[in-house]
Regions:
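An alpha-helical support segment within catalytic cores of ATP-dependent transferases
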Residues: 1-72, 167, 171-173
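Short, solvent-exposed polar/charged micro-motifs at secondary-structure junctions
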Residues: 16-19, 79, 149-150
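A short, ordered amphipathic alpha-helix with a cationic face
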Residues: 20-24, 93-94, 140-141
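Generic alpha-helical secondary structure signal
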Residues: 21-28, 46, 50-53, 81, ...
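Helix-rich C-terminal or lid/interface subdomains of diverse kinases
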Residues: 27-31, 63, 105-177
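N-terminal hydrophobic alpha-helix used for membrane targeting or insertion
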Residues: 55, 60-62, 80, 92, ...
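Active-site Asp-x-Gly
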Residues: 67-70, 75, 80-130
Length: 177
């Protein structure tokens, strides 16, 4: 089926915070994640500001993203496989109506041109590489960069100091790329 809005699903499967386009959803997420972090941290403010500037450049492309039902935490640790065949997904607490680009944000750090993973995914998903493959890669990388802000908050709330520092390093890589 198709969906008219982007957002998270709660345990009653009602859409929370529906958005009519993906850039509005991302803007809301970035502000929510930023507000959960230390508002006096100049680096966090600089990173969130960079995300908002990038969002304004990518807004039209992001709004072409079509909403679909997504797992929401598509990371290797949540994918069950046997003999190179995906047999299941676990950890559905972040499921919602997003887009394929959102779904791939966590896997993008493992995807590169050398291993061909992203190309293989798109060929499997669409039957061929989309005509705007390079644009899709940029969008996925941007969504990953935005999601890192949320992950930083998770690290802080869970007291995971080591992963917090690793995440800040990844943020620096995005900020200076």
């Amino acid at each position: 089926g198709t969906y008219d809005a982007f957002g998270l699903l709660n345990d009653g499967l009602d859409v929370q915070q529906p958005f009519q386009n993906f850039s509005s959803f991302l803007r809301w997420q970035i502000l929510k994640w930023q507000n959960r972090l230390d508002s006096n941290d100049v680096y966090i403010l600089e990173y969130a500001s960079w995300l908002m500037r990038e969002l304004s450049f990518l807004e039209d492309v992001l709004n072409e993203c079509r909403p679909v039902f997504c797992h929401g935490d598509f990371d290797f640790k949540n994918i069950l496989a046997e003999k190179n065949i995906i047999t299941g997904l676990v950890d559905w607490e972040h499921a919602g109506i997003f887009c394929v680009e959102w779904e791939l944000r966590k896997l993008s750090r493992y995807c590169n041109e050398k291993n061909g993973f992203l190309k293989s995914f798109f060929i499997g998903y669409y039957g061929s590489l989309p005509h705007n493959y390079e644009v899709k890669k940029r969008v996925i990388k941007y969504i990953e960069a935005a999601d890192i802000l949320g992950h930083l908050g998770w690290c802080k709330r869970s007291g995971n100091v080591e992963e917090y520092e690793e995440t800040k390093e990844r943020m620096k890589d995005f900020l200076h790329s």
